[in-house]
Amino acid sequence: IDDLSDSQSCEKIHTYVQNLLRTSYQDQVKVSDNHFLNLILSRYIQLCRDQNIAFETDIRAGLLGFLDYQDMTALFTNLLDNAVASASEMESTSFIDLRIRHLPESSCTLISLINSCPSSPYDALTGTLSTKKKNKMRHGYGMRSVSRVVKAHQGNMDLYYDDESKPFHTTVQFPDE
């Protein structure tokens, strides 16, 4: 999806989305009032079940309507791909916690994704996110797509790792439109 998004292959993205809509995943979960987000999340909920990763969500109603299918796909699939990859490396209990809510005092929508992470994902020398992907040339495309979506909607993204308790935190804030 990321490659299709970057090359702006709208017809191929549309075909992919239509195939998603026809999959058996569509009846598995309803964690939000956004049908398309449910389709995306159902895949990750199943992946987490298969890998014994606890997956928790708290998604408030009426949010994310400003994201089109392409942006929603780029944002959530890339963040969740990374979260599942990281959580699956844990030797003990692993988890992913996704929360989406509106913060009226800040006039923004907050996406909070916290996942277990066995060690710091940051390169000790450069301070940038590192990868364990076999094809190092593909490193960074997903997060660049996420950053593109965040920037396109005048949002902010923060990433941080807690060395003591071992979770990796991703927070994305989108201002009210």
Across the structure, where does each feature detected by a protein language model lie?
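Conserved short strand/loop->alpha-helix "switch" segment adjacent to the catalytic nucleotide/phosphoryl-transfer site
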Residues: 29, 54-75
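Hydrophobic residues in the alpha-helical elements that line and stabilize the ATP-binding pocket
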Residues: 79, 83
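Short beta-to-alpha transition helix within the HATPase_c
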Residues: 15-22, 33-51
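Short beta-strand/loop element within the Bergerat-fold HATPase_c
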Residues: 93-107
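Glycine-rich/acidic phosphate-handling loop/turn and adjacent ATP-lid/helix
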Residues: 107-140
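A short, flexible helix-to-loop-to-beta junction within the catalytic ATP-binding CA
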Residues: 84-92
